[in-house]
Amino acid sequence: MTKGILGRKIGMTQIFAENGDLIPVTVIHATPNVVLQKKTIENDGYEAIQLGFEDISEKRANKPQIGHAAKANTAPKRFIREIRGANIDEYEVGQEVKVDIFSEGEIVDVTGISKGKGFQGAIKRHGQSRGPMAHGSRYHRRPGSMGSIAPNRVFKTKNLPGRMGGERVTIQNLKIVKVDPERNLLLIKGNVPGPRKGLVIVKSAVKAAKKAK
């Protein structure tokens, strides 16, 4: 079954394995999440648990948010996300979910919002090849041809300049190197989406489970 927790990306560092290998890791700070609601097939059409992360003052919350959190005997939360595929029988409303639900060596998927890059050209945004840099070339970093004359329009799939980043991105099959329950930290091998202090969702890997079967 799927497990998950919400946290914030602290940054990257490196640690040494027992054999001396250098491992680049991303540190994620995941304070205890609270189960705010259990979604059931009878009432909602699907099964999921709703997790809340980071308290906010009641002054900054509206009445529905305060009432929803009160059902779980907790304060209103800044972030609320659902974890589908979880075994809802293992959870109760108001229960805390901590980093110790994961173990070292476990494979997870990490979801976050990618860094915003602003307005960028086709080369940086889509990885398109640039034009000749020779003196006689008439274009260097332009998108190039807009397509054939016959359609009398530009197709939607044409790679063009535009706003880059700020999108929901998931990196799959990352390995948990270390779990630190005392400091609520997860050390995950490699990089994860988003800037420092950005919200991330760590869930059990989908494809790794299929391979195991």
Swiss-Prot record:
<keyword id="KW-0687">Ribonucleoprotein</keyword>
<keyword id="KW-0689">Ribosomal protein</keyword>
<comment type="subunit">
    <text>Part of the 50S ribosomal subunit. Forms a cluster with proteins L14 and L19.</text>
</comment>
<dbReference type="GO" id="GO:0003735">
    <property type="term" value="F:structural constituent of ribosome"/>
</dbReference>
<comment type="similarity">
    <text>Belongs to the universal ribosomal protein uL3 family.</text>
</comment>
<dbReference type="InterPro" id="IPR019927">
    <property type="entry name" value="Ribosomal_uL3_bac/org-type"/>
</dbReference>
<comment type="function">
    <text>One of the primary rRNA binding proteins, it binds directly near the 3'-end of the 23S rRNA, where it nucleates assembly of the 50S subunit.</text>
</comment>
<dbReference type="InterPro" id="IPR019926">
    <property type="entry name" value="Ribosomal_uL3_CS"/>
</dbReference>
<dbReference type="InterPro" id="IPR000597">
    <property type="entry name" value="Ribosomal_uL3"/>
</dbReference>
<keyword id="KW-0694">RNA-binding</keyword>
<feature type="region of interest" description="Disordered">
    <location>
        <begin position="124"/>
        <end position="151"/>
    </location>
</feature>
<dbReference type="Pfam" id="PF00297">
    <property type="entry name" value="Ribosomal_L3"/>
</dbReference>
<protein>
    <recommendedName>
        <fullName>Large ribosomal subunit protein uL3</fullName>
    </recommendedName>
</protein>
<keyword id="KW-0699">rRNA-binding</keyword>
<dbReference type="GO" id="GO:0019843">
    <property type="term" value="F:rRNA binding"/>
</dbReference>
<dbReference type="GO" id="GO:0006412">
    <property type="term" value="P:translation"/>
</dbReference>
<dbReference type="InterPro" id="IPR009000">
    <property type="entry name" value="Transl_B-barrel_sf"/>
</dbReference>
<dbReference type="GO" id="GO:0022625">
    <property type="term" value="C:cytosolic large ribosomal subunit"/>
</dbReference>
